[in-house]
UniProtKB/Swiss-Prot annotation:
Belongs to the RNase HII family. Its main location: cytoplasm. PANTHER family: RIBONUCLEASE H2 SUBUNIT A (PTHR10954), RIBONUCLEASE HII (PTHR10954:SF18). This is Ribonuclease HII. It catalyses: Endonucleolytic cleavage to 5'-phosphomonoester. Its cofactor is Mn(2+); Mg(2+). The keyword Metal-binding applies. Keywords: Cytoplasm, Endonuclease, Hydrolase, Manganese, Metal-binding, Nuclease. Residues 14-200 form the RNase H type-2 domain. CDD domains: RNase_HII_bacteria_HII_like. The keyword Oxidoreductase does not apply. It comes from the Bacteria.
């Protein structure tokens, strides 16, 4: 059962790409976007909003998406680009990059959220789209698995910040590490909690 009205899509072809992002809220690292065109002949069971799935389930589904989707791509906008553009515009840049990186050209986009990313391919926004359409759910999963792996890699280089645990979000642990150690090169300088602890 869902609280959402039925999703009406103005496209009935086979090149519909779901688009989603992960990483707008963290204080460190890139914002990551993914675009996925599912193959109706190879359905993937269990696609949902990545935040509702266990890490083990997300990893298994990410493998299935890469193997069974008609096309998929992941892209990002760096912390430097976030600082230069702001997080809103950087998120849309990452989305456009993911759409452009698809090995099969999308004909229609379903984008999670309430703003289109400014791509020339037509489409529509879907609020809570990762819960309402499988292609957006698949994009959410790929983006989160990719970004989480980046945070684990950053944790291995800087374990004192705890990135593997909080994934860069402004948790008490992360804020305490910032206060104690200061920001890393990978931190987003334009975000207030980071700006506060930068050395002048």
């Amino acid at each position: 059962m869902t609280d959402f009205p039925p999703l009406v899509i103005d496209y009935h072809g086979s090149r519909l790409a779901g688009v989603d992002e992960v990483g707008r809220g963290p204080l460190v690292g890139a914002v990551v976007a993914a675009a996925v065109i599912l193959d109706p002949a190879r359905p993937i069971e269990g696609l949902a909003d990545s935040k509702t799935l266990s890490e083990k389930r997300r990893l298994a589904l990410a493998d299935a998406i890469r193997e069974q989707a008609a096309a998929c791509a992941v892209a990002e906008a760096s912390a430097e680009e976030i600082d230069a553009l702001n997080i809103f515009h950087a998120t849309h840049l990452a989305m456009r990059r993911a759409i452009d990186a698809l090995p099969v050209t999308a004909e229609y986009l379903l984008v999670d959220g309430n703003r289109m990313p400014g791509h020339h391919v037509p489409g529509q926004c879907v609020v809570k789209g990762d819960r309402r359409h499988a292609a957006i759910g698949a994009a959410s999963i790929l983006a989160k698995v990719t970004r989480d792996a980046q945070m684990v890699a950053l944790h291995e280089r800087h374990p004192e910040y705890g990135f593997a645990r909080h994934k860069g979000y402004p948790t008490r642990e992360h804020l305490a590490a910032l206060e104690r150690l200061g920001p890393l090169e990978e931190h987003r300088r334009s975000f207030a909690p980071v700006k506060q602890w930068q050395l002048l």
